[in-house]
Amino acid sequence: MNPRTLLNKRHQDALDLLASALQRDSAYEKLTGPDLASYSSEPIAGWMTTVCIKGAEIRLDVVITGTFPDDPPSIYIADRGIDLFLKNPHVEENGKICTISDSAAVDANWPVELFRYSVDAAVDILTNEITQDFLDEFTSYWSRSQGKKRREFFVVEPPSSLGKDATAVICGERILIGASYESVRQWAEHNGEKLDHLSTAGACHVVRFSSPLLPRDYPNTIADLRKLLRSNGATQALSLDRHLCKSNDLLAILFVQSTPHGDALAGILTKGYGLSRDRKLSDGFRLGHVPKSLLFARAAAKLQNGLLERANAQRVDHEWIHTRGGVGTEMFGASVCLIGCGSLGSYVAHLLAKAGIGRITLIDSQLMEWENVGRHLLGASDIGTSKAEALRIRIQRDLPHLSVEAIPRDWRAWAKECDDPFGGFDLVVSTIADWRHERSLNLLARSLDFPPVVFGWLEPFALAGHALTVTGGGGCLECGMNGFGQFEKRVLVLEDGTLKKEPGGCAYYQEYGPMRLVPCATLVAEAVVRALTGPVDASEISTLIGDLSLLSDCGGRLSKAWEKKLNPQLTEQIIIQKWTINPTCQLCSV
């Protein structure tokens, strides 16, 4: 039996069971012909029933679609003359009554009970008029009240940080809101947009309410808006009047409404009219000398029927993107330098950006090649470009509220040109996996006033990975390496060499795939976050050991030191240990 036949059979069995039950119930009559076809949700079957709501009889049509019983029936008010949209919660423009949330699970094993429950829920919605639901789900109702033209506000900074006057910039169908033009410009440019060519700047009036608005209070005209603002504070209405009379520019109004779960946002757009220069408003006075109170009163009378455009308002700021309104400022204020944008480094950089680190600098001198594609965050479209620059573009476009810089050079050459190259960073990450580079970086970390450094590297086949955090206390990288950069506390012992040589070339590489790589990248990123949020007072090393059952397939075994530390029953283990000074280390033992 193929999938379509199986799903169709379950649907038909549920429908037959439902039809049999309703045939014996005189309260229901089957929908046929035009009545059923009038619904645009591809109806398969339907029934009508009449219910009594506050002394009035209302016919409900209960419509079954091809996804029943996985999805509940759709219930509509049949009389299109009864308009309860924005009067009763959960009633849509077309008369559909939303009885069960889209995300709610239903038990498909009981189709008749699901049908009756849905009808009972619809009656309850119509009877009780649960006003609180309008407040709890304000953004949904505000969005549906907008009509056909639906522009959106993108608020690029936390609403709590905005004063009563902010900046609004039109960028296509979006209106970008921020504390200043500069903050909006930076977000837009990080998102790949140039405001000079696409935008018009104006003012944004930020209005705060102690609770969300009910639909009956949604303003349609400037007169409605002034009345609403007066009820919320006389100074807010006066501020609106000043904006309207000031110029012909765009005026955006951002509603910030307090709820138990945070601020609910809504937007309104209108346009200033430059009424301070309207001669008719100056009757009896010299132009420009009308008392402000009288000017505003005359302006209000002229503008009271001016229409408003409602808009959704979306938060796109750091706090919301990364923590949904929770903490996050600590990470946003952090600055990290990552050296090495190869396979491991690219995923580490991506994770650090997703974690919300506010400023990231990427350093790598190499170009993206075809042989990198299979296990690198970047892909075919980036071939021939700088790994650091392509990664910067990828992260910056995905997370425009962050600041990402690329330095496509050998980090040592770059560092020699700067007086204090790493002084502005809270932490440095090295995933370059080249002993000549990492030994130099370790020297700087031990010899200078230097931020903490996290060194990340993989063992063969990425069956083990390490993240060594070097701070002022404890050991350094060389405390665990021999003179040739070989790790002396490795997890795996392999009889044969694991480096592979490229055909006809001089380059070597390690065999491993993305499935083993990504957990190791997570290990390194977590070490970075732990060091930033601390305290990590002394050096430590985090080690990830993957599926030990794969060791024999690779011709390897655990080192004797690690055999004693690991639980052979676990398929993946992380062990964090203090990294102490090696008495023979030439840097730490001085």
Stretches with model-predicted labels:
Residues D133, R144-A300, G423-L427, T431-V590:
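Glycine-rich phosphate/adenylate-binding loop
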Residues R324-L367:
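Glycine-rich adenosine-cofactor-binding loop
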Residues S365-H401:
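Glycine-rich phosphate-binding loop and adjoining beta1-alpha1-beta2 segment
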Residues L351, E417-C418, R439-L444:
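A short acidic, amphipathic alpha-helical/loop segment
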Residues R392-D426, I432-D434:
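A structured beta-alpha segment of the ubiquitous adenosine-cofactor-binding alpha/beta core
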Residues G33-D102, V112-E113:
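Compact alpha/beta protein-protein interaction domains typified by the UBC
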Residues N2, P72, D79-C171:
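Domain-scale recognition of soluble eukaryotic interaction modules
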Residues G274-V336:
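N-terminal charged helix/coil linker that caps or initiates catalytic domains
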